[in-house]
From Swiss-Prot:
One of its GO terms (molecular function) is DNA binding. Coiled coil: none annotated. GO terms for cellular component: male germ cell nucleus; nucleosome; nucleus. PANTHER family: SPERMATID NUCLEAR TRANSITION PROTEIN 1. One of its GO terms (biological process) is sperm DNA condensation. It comes from Bos taurus (Bovine). It holds the Pfam family TP1. The gene is TNP1. This is Spermatid nuclear transition protein 1. Testis.
Length: 55
């Protein structure tokens, strides 16, 4: 029982330690990407339109 408990705690600890960085990085990048993608997409479209109209 003690061994299984140790393994469980270690696994949980390892997962917790390993996931935060990935999770934070992923969520941050996803959120940033989503927000910027919507804004940048609109901006890119406007820029392309302006460039085309200017050209």
């Amino acid at each position: 029982m003690s061994t299984s408990r140790k393994l469980k705690s270690q696994g949980m600890r390892r997962g917790k330690n390993r996931t935060p960085h990935k999770g934070v990085k992923r969520s941050g990048s996803k959120r940033k990407y989503r927000k910027s993608s919507l804004k940048s997409r609109k901006r890119c479209d406007d820029a392309n339109r302006n460039l085309r109209s200017h050209l």
